[in-house]
């Protein structure tokens, strides 16, 4: 959260916002507390590109792109389970994903990000961060169908970058 606060306080960011400068994209990390970038993209009239360095599908990224994230065949990476999950493992995976996404992330983390945005953009009315997140045009993920999640359906705007080596 402190990194977002420092970024939104930075002189160059403030200048770009005041000048009404337009950008093509704003890249936002998929992990927690980077969601302030969604509102920054709206202010800069830019497309949102979500990137993830995790090797697993993240439920809120899948939700943002409108693609399925089914914990019955996509085990939660924080849990110990096999790819051939039992009913108990599937249930635990489902409950864990729900608590992480809706309890921790959507309620707690996004609440803190909203307070941060209120600090930097006082008095401005804005859509919810979840609504802004649904405007993401692309997701770049350091994942690969052969590791972690395995094969699962993804949209064309979800790009697996895993196992690519840039030299």
Q: Which residue stretches match the model-derived regions?
A:
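Nucleotide-sugar-dependent glycosyltransferase catalytic domains
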Residues: 1-167
């Amino acid at each position: 959260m402190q990194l977002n606060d420092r970024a939104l306080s930075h002189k160059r960011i403030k200048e770009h916002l005041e000048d009404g400068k337009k950008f093509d994209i704003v890249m936002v990390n998929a992990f927690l507390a980077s969601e302030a970038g969604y509102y920054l993209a709206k202010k800069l009239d830019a497309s949102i590109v979500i990137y993830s360095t995790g090797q697993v599908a993240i439920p809120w990224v899948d939700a943002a792109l409108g693609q399925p994230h089914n914990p019955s065949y996509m085990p939660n990476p924080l849990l110990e389970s096999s790819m051939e999950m039992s009913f108990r493992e599937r249930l635990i995976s489902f409950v864990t994903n729900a608590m992480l996404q809706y309890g921790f992330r959507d309620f707690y983390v996004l609440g803190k990000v909203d307070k941060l945005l209120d600090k930097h953009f006082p008095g401005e009315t804005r859509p919810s961060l979840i609504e802004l997140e649904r405007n993401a045009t692309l997701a770049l993920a350091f994942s690969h169908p052969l590791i972690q999640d395995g094969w699962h359906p993804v949209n064309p705007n979800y790009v697996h970058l895993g196992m690519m080596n840039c030299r």
